[in-house]
Amino acid sequence: MSSERVLSYAPAFKSFLDTSFFQELSRLKLDVLKLDSTCQPLTVNLDLHNIPKSADQVPLFLTNRSFEKHNNKRTNEVPLQGSIFNFNVLDEFKNLDKQLFLHQRALECWEDGIKDINKCVSFVIISFADLKKYRFYYWLGVPCFQRPSSTVLHVRPEPSLKGLFSKCQKWFDVNYSKWVCILDADDEIVNYDKCIIRKTKVLAIRDTSTMENVPSALTKNFLSVLQYDVPDLIDFKLLIIRQNEGSFALNATFASIDPQSSSSNPDMKVSGWERNVQGKLAPRVVDLSSLLDPLKIADQSVDLNLKLMKWRILPDLNLDIIKNTKVLLLGAGTLGCYVSRALIAWGVRKITFVDNGTVSYSNPVRQALYNFEDCGKPKAELAAASLKRIFPLMDATGVKLSIPMIGHKLVNEEAQHKDFDRLRALIKEHDIIFLLVDSRESRWLPSLLSNIENKTVINAALGFDSYLVMRHGNRDEQSSKQLGCYFCHDVVAPTDSLTDRTLDQMCTVTRPGVAMMASSLAVELMTSLLQTKYSGSETTVLGDIPHQIRGFLHNFSILKLETPAYEHCPACSPKVIEAFTDLGWEFVKKALEHPLYLEEISGLSVIKQEVERLGNDVFEWEDDESDEIA
């Protein structure tokens, strides 16, 4: 090097942001920060011992652990505190006055540095995260400041200080959080002290540059603070310490005596924005959509819109309880298909279909999970496979099973007993049961079993231009109030409604939009219900939790109704529950073959007899009145 020159500087760091950094930023933005764009702390551990030979600066590696307050450092690593400002809108990021922003950060470093010279080093990242496209815009800045008077105009080599290099390196290894040290009157390396350096005039700085005889721009920060502490200092000795080879010593001269030694808000030049890969002073853009696992992207994207609800509209919405709910769909037809699509849109991950039918040629146009090639194949398995094609991380299962129906005589008792056992096991394994089958009698056994297992039931049923959506009231021993089930309005036990029906009665003849309306309301009722552990609560963060919703398309009206449980209900009355508890399958078998048996157990037969007696009394009274008139 020449005998005398103006001191020049190299960039402080070269940034490397790992994909895990952006993934953690995405998680924090969605789940924690939301609309908060204020400063968030970062921590980086610099490895100054293992710098690649091809690198001109120390790599600044940022990973998901950079967001941790206590980022565990390894031996000889140097901790560095920084921050990130993640903007909500791309235009905010673009229109930010970058120079003013960096100047403000430099003033913060200056204010920290005049209290402790080791605190005048930091870094900052400004960013915008496009979470839909997985594109991240960011720019790293390392605030490097220099007051006019602290410009080093003359530097000359000082070979006599080379013997201090190893001592300084060892001192920095022990004092890993320090960036500067000084030489005292006894030629010992000690912590920075402005009273001592005023006399010895020897300053050693830890360096992050690898360029020969060119220190990093961070040196300007330390020299500015040094001159503030010792305003009359002109000539001094400067040691640039690198943990590997390349340390050097200089005789240095400040441009002038500091005229602003008492100023805490000095006039200073600030630089530090990192250049991009093209060598331009501009932000960088990272597109992770092609780098991340598509399944990981799908998993996060499914929850994106749901989590955005919590940013502004519903901050108290509990999405985890919905996501972790295990749902059983009894019926994989029109209702089952639409309900399942609404469930996965709400983030439900576990769905089991139960159906014993196959896809007919009339189904694909109305049942959203099937297409023409599926005709003739089992519905339940196909529905589960279709959900997995839509979202591969779904835990979807299809079970081909015939639900034993009341009023239908046993054909194969062994097989139907197995179906009963399997159905009861499925109901036990799931949290919410949707009854989406196409006959009243097929709803009886699931209603009974769900009541026995105290499971929440959501019922959806269709008419030509009407629909019913209702939830069954769970048994609550602490409350005398219990809502009615699907059968609580019946005055007779369910019977065979499928035999001897014409074609228009066997097929589901409804206005096509009715199924979609009922399905969506059924799922929305479930999500509202899940927001509170008390099924009888009137409102949640999502609003009301009605018992029944009845819709009529002929005048486009909706009614919300509530009815209590009926003490003689053939599905949920205490006597029916008691009989099933005592007899199990034997009770079910008798009820299937002899509906009148169920009426006797529930007490409906007594009600029928009383009604008939009252009717006879009325007729006798009318006959007496006629005789008198005559």
Swiss-Prot record:
CC per GO annotation: cytoplasm; cytosol; extrinsic component of phagophore assembly site membrane; membrane; mitochondrion; phagophore assembly site
Gene3D superfamilies: NAD(P)-binding Rossmann-like Domain, Ubiquitin-like modifier-activating enzyme ATG7 C-terminal domain, Ubiquitin-like modifier-activating enzyme ATG7 N-terminal domain
Keywords: Autophagy, Cytoplasm, Protein transport, Transport, Ubl conjugation pathway
Effect listed in the UniProt record for changing E524R: Impaired homodimerization and ATP-binding
A Pfam family recorded for this sequence: ATG7_N
Chain positions covered by the region annotation Homodimerization: 591-630
Top-level taxonomic group: Eukaryota
Entry comment, domain topic: The C-terminal 40 residues are required for homodimerization, as well as the interactions with ATG3, ATG8 and ATG12; and the C-terminal 17 residues are required for the ATG8 lipidation.
Description of how the protein assembles with itself and partners: Homodimer; homodimerization is required for ATP-binding. Interacts with ATG8 through a thioester bond between Cys-507 and the C-terminal 'Gly-116' of ATG8 and with ATG12 through a thioester bond between Cys-507 and the C-terminal 'Gly-186' of ATG12. Also interacts with ATG3.
Protein name per Swiss-Prot or TrEMBL: Ubiquitin-like modifier-activating enzyme ATG7
